[in-house]
Each structure stands twice: as structure tokens, then as C-alpha cells.
């Protein structure tokens, strides 16, 4: 009887641990319905995540290892990659290729970790033409 009880406890814990294992695969493309974020099946969904600081000021954190760590240790289902446009040592307007490399590292890390990523065009000015080209 004890072994059966232990089996169910372990099984329950494993289900809980694996619930975010394939988060994007499970929920697919997200959209907004009214005021609610919904998944591919129109079911309400809540994302939990962390924001990276601007890539132009803290580029050392823009890598797949950091994304994986955030997923595992913080149980993130989304990360925000803030692309610094004008400010910092390597802003997008002055170091475009470097900026794209840093952003791509986070995006690839999110894909590998099966979590969502929000790309933030973080600009204190409009830079509309540059934003159109980027997106």
C-alpha cells in the first residue's frame, strides 16, 4: 500500500514539474480576445516571465544559457528582450549587426527552451523608419 501511495505522489510531482516543459508547443500562437490573452484554442493563458535589461548596456546576459536558467530557476514561460536603440555602448542605431546577434541569441534560446519571447523596440524617440525596417 505504501509503495502505491509513493508512486502516486511521485507521479503527481512529475506532472507538475513537466507542465511547463513544452509550453509553446502546448499553447501555440497567442492572441487577444477582448481583454484576455488566449492560446491557440482560445483558452485564457497567463505568462510568467522576466525582462532582460537593454542589450546595449548588458549584452553579456543575452544568451541561450541565461534564457534556459530563467526558465528552470524562475519557471518563466516568457522573456522580454529589450533592444536598446539609442542608449548604451552598443545601441541598435550604431551597432546594428551586434544588436541583431544579441537578440537572435535570446530568441534562439527561447525557442530551444520552448518559451515565448517579447521583442521590445526600446527607444526614447520614435525612429519609425528604423523600426519598420527591423520588424
Feature annotation, model-predicted:
Residues 23-135:
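Active-site mouth of glycoside hydrolases
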Residues 1-22:
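Bacterial Sec-dependent N-terminal signal peptides
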